Each structure stands twice: as structure tokens, then as C-alpha cells.
């Protein structure tokens, strides 16, 4: 067995009455842990290699804590706490970044992104949806939907209320980790698996999906869809949209460069370069016909928006008299043609 791992984490989670995992909380996930740490815990777990999620007892957690005491004080302290748990425990070991095979593995990878250890698109998330059970997220934690009605009745009989906040595959990120230096006005609008960079403010209408996020700093008042990453200093106006990779059958990865502004109720279906502005209310899809204007507001040519993908210093607007979508630049006609040909 190799003493190297891609990732390792000790977790505490929730199971249904059949013993199936509903969710797992990893307080301190590790990316590429030290070989000596792996060598110390492998014999105690009976781990021989591969990607595995191994359920452990509190006694085993105490043994692991002792083994790690001279090697990693933080993980030793965590395991000491886990040894007192009244909830199911699991150790998840990923030898490689391969397709997912279990719910604890899926939760570990979502944690790695939200802990800012890996950026969106940096992990293999193949097979994640079948491995994330659709559960009721309540004031008493995750509840299997098949057990929800009985749990609600039990609560009422005790004079309590089991409040259901959402029914979804993904929990909100802040129930698992709150990254340093961020503001999130409505925590339900940021899913676990979001990467929220330092200096990011997510206002009430903002939303960040899993495997998506922001470099920060920036203001998010619109939707950062799955797969989308927003560069530093960029702002998304109220109600604006970024087209994700999960809907519409598109395979273009949408990104927003640095210093961009997407206006309120606007949207993009192409990746933006740096210092781009999209006028409020204007939705640009890849096939949108755009009149390209030079530095003197003269028409250079009509192109599809996809031909401008990734270009910097562009202003997208709609002509209020003709309705034509225009792209204004600070470049001459010659420079624009050269840029377009270079892109092709």
C-alpha cells in the first residue's frame, strides 16, 4: 500500500434507520496528508488502499487519536472529540481523485471545495448526484424522507416542532464551514461545495451553487450557477444570471474574469474576459448576434457572442432605438479584427 493519499478526513454524520449515510460533517479535511500520518492510521483501520469510507467506533477513534498525537496535534484533538460522539463516525480515505463511489466520499469532495482547498473544476465529481440522497434538512439535522412523517409526529407529541428548512440533495454550506472573510446575507442560498473567496459578499438575492464560486473580493447579488467561477473584483448585479453547465446541454464552461460587472437582471452564456461590462437587462447567449463597434462607435462587423468569449475590455449593451445588441470596445477596427482572428 502506498503511504500517500489524495485526501483524508475524519467525520461524524447522520444515517437513516437502515444504516445508509444521509450526510457527513468533516471538521478538518486534509488534502494530500503527510505519508507518516497515513502510515500511522492504516493498520488501525485495516486500510489496504483505494478509495474507501470506513465506519469506526468511538474506541477506534480514541486509538486513532493516540496514534496521531505525536504527528498532528489538530487531527489528534479532533479525534479526541470524535471519540466522545453519540453519532456515527467515518474515516474517508481517497487514494486518488477518481469517480465517486459513496456518500461520505461525495461529502468529502464538497468539503474540500468549500474549505478552499480545491477550486471549482479541480475535482472529479462524476457520479455525485445518485450518491447524494434527497433528504429533509430540519432543525434536528438531516432526516430521511421515508422517516420524516413519523419524526414530525414524535416531535409534536413532545410539544416540539420539527421544522423543515428544505428538501434537497445539497445542504447549505454554512452548516458545515464558514470560510474566513465573507458575508452571506441568506445562508440558504449558498450550497455546500461552493467556493466563496475571501472578501466576497453574497447579498440576499445572490446564489452560489456547488462546484462554483468566487475568487473574491466581489459582490454577488445574482446567480453563480454550477461550474461558474467569478474572478476577483467582479460584481454580479441583482437578479443576474450566469448560465451553468448542468442545464441546456451546453458544454461551454462559463467564467467571469477580473473586474467585471454584470448588471441587474442581465445574463451571460459565454465566458467573459477581464474588465467586461454587461448592461442591465441584457442576456447574452452564445448565439446572440452582436454588432461590434470600434473606438469611434463605427460598425466593424456582426459576430456571434461566442466569438467574443474570453476577450477583455468589452461593454455589451442594447441599442435603445433599434434593439440591436452592441459591443463597444476601446480598440481600433484593425485591432478588433486581429483579436477575433487570434481567438479563432
Give the label of every model feature segment.
Residues 106-109, 180, 252, 274:
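General structural feature for long, well-ordered alpha-helical segments within catalytic domains
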Residues 1-175, 306-344:
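Terminal amphipathic alpha-helical/low-complexity segments used for targeting or macromolecular assembly
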Residues 225, 230-232, 236-344:
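Glycine-rich hexapeptide-repeat left-handed beta-helix
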Residues 152-204, 208-209, 213-215:
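Glycine-rich adenosyl-nucleotide cofactor-binding module
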Amino acid at each position: 500500500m502506498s503511504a500517500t493519499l489524495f485526501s483524508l478526513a475524519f467525520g461524524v454524520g447522520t444515517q437513516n434507520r437502515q444504516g445508509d449515510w444521509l450526510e457527513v460533517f468533516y471538521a478538518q479535511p486534509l488534502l494530500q496528508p503527510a505519508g507518516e500520518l497515513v502510515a500511522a492510521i492504516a493498520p488501525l483501520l485495516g486500510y489496504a488502499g483505494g478509495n474507501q469510507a470506513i465506519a469506526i467506533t468511538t474506541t477506534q477513534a480514541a486509538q486513532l487519536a493516540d496514534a496521531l498525537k505525536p504527528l498532528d496535534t489538530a487531527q489528534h484533538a479532533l479525534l479526541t472529540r470524535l471519540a466522545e460522539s453519540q453519532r456515527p463516525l467515518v474515516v474517508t480515505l481517497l487514494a486518488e481523485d477518481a469517480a465517486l463511489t459513496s456518500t461520505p466520499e461525495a461529502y468529502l469532495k464538497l468539503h474540500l471545495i468549500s474549505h478552499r482547498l480545491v477550486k471549482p473544476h479541480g475535482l472529479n465529481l462524476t457520479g455525485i448526484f445518485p450518491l447524494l440522497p434527497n433528504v429533509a434538512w430540519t432543525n434536528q439535522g438531516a432526516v430521511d424522507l421515508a422517516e420524516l412523517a413519523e419524526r414530525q409526529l414524535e416531535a409534536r407529541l413532545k410539544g416540539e416542532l420539527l421544522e423543515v428548512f428544505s428538501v434537497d440533495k445539497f445542504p447549505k454550506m454554512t452548516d458545515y464551514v464558514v470560510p474566513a472573510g465573507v458575508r452571506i446575507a441568506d445562508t440558504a442560498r449558498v450550497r455546500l461545495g461552493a467556493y466563496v473567496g475571501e472578501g466576497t459578499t453574497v447579498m440576499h438575492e445572490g446564489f452560489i451553487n456547488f462546484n462554483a464560486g468566487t475568487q473574491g473580493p466581489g459582490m454577488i447579488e445574482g446567480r453563480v450557477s454550477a461550474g461558474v467561477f467569478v474572478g476577483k473584483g467582479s460584481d454580479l448585479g441583482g437578479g443576474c444570471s450566469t448560465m451553468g453547465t448542468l442545464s441546456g446541454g451546453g458544454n461551454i464552461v462559463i467564467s467571469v474574469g477580473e473586474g467585471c460587472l454584470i448588471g441587474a437582471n442581465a445574463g451571460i452564456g459565454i465566458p467573459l474576459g477581464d474588465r467586461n461590462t454587461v448592461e442591465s437587462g441584457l442576456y447574452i447567449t452564445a448565439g446572440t448576434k452582436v454588432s461590434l463597434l470600434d473606438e469611434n462607435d463605427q460598425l466593424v462587423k456582426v459576430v456571434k457572442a461566442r466569438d467574443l468569449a474570453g476577450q477583455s475590455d468589452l461593454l455589451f449593451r442594447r441599442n435603445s432605438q433599434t434593439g440591436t445588441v452592441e459591443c463597444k470596445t476601446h480598440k481600433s477596427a484593425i485591432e478588433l479584427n486581429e483579436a477575433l482572428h487570434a481567438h479563432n
